[in-house]
Regions:
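Short amphipathic alpha-helical interaction segments
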Residues: 166, 170, 179, 183, ...
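Short alpha-helical "packing" element that flanks the helix-turn-helix/winged-helix DNA-binding module
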Residues: 174-182, 191, 222
Length: 226
């Protein structure tokens, strides 16, 4: 039996960029499964993020801030070998069969995420936004895309995601690991030990790379976003 939610939820739909070009499909699938499992352990979800069709994956969260964090953790877990993009939607959803895995969604919130995924793919084709990997569409007050004015939370989210993706693009693999570490609660001493460098070196890398700014922005948005 289908279950409907009148309360808006955050739907995440992601896919692997250039998946057909990967020579080792088994490696890709294994890495993706591990990344999704790691994100599910770190961020509480209404619907755990799972592979749905092909190289797409989806999940649902009670809060937009949680969906934004989950998307980043998945991406950081997969970089640099595998890059991914994300559409985030906010609105009511319908789950046709809660027992089915992966769960099949429909409704304004799901279509908002689908539209956001299409939008980010199109925007990334332009030079000025080529590093964009995440977009957000709010469909909590209207079921159609139309020309409805963007809500303040949606504006905050889109602005932050655009800057966040640009910062991520300027990081190397070590900086990705360090950012993932601070987002998941690791101390600088723990990160230094894992990387085989000194704690002051970790501090310097986190500051210069923009990782601290990303973490702080997530903490602030967690307080104001639905």
């Amino acid at each position: 039996m289908a279950q409907s939610s009148e309360t808006p939820v955050a739907t995440l739909i992601g896919d692997v960029i250039g998946s057909r070009l990967h020579a080792d499909r088994a490696f890709l699938q294994h890495r993706l499964d591990d990344a999704l499992a790691a994100a599910s352990q770190r961020v509480a979800a209404l619907q755990p993020v799972e592979v749905s069709v092909g190289d797409e994956f989806q999940g649902a969260y009670a809060r937009l801030a949680d969906a934004m964090l989950a998307a980043l953790l998945i991406r950081l877990e997969l970089l640099p070998e595998i890059d991914t993009r994300y559409g985030l939607g906010w609105g009511p959803i319908e789950v046709f069969d809660p027992a089915r895995r992966p769960a099949a969604q429909d409704g304004p919130g799901w279509w908002a995420a689908r539209d956001a995924l299409t939008e980010v793919e199109q925007r990334a084709e332009h030079t000025q936004s080529r590093h964009l990997r995440t977009w957000f569409v709010d469909r909590s007050t209207t079921a159609s895309a139309g020309s409805a004015p963007r809500s303040a939370p949606a504006g905050f989210a889109v602005a932050f995601l655009s800057v966040r993706d640009e910062i991520i693009a300027g990081m190397d693999e070590r900086k990705h690991r360090l950012l993932r570490g601070v987002l998941t609660g690791a101390t600088q001493a723990e990160l230094a030990s894992a990387e085989g460098i000194t704690q002051p070196a970790v501090s310097q890398l986190l500051t210069r790379s923009g990782a601290h700014a990303v973490r702080l922005a997530h903490e602030q948005l967690d307080e104001i976003l639905p």
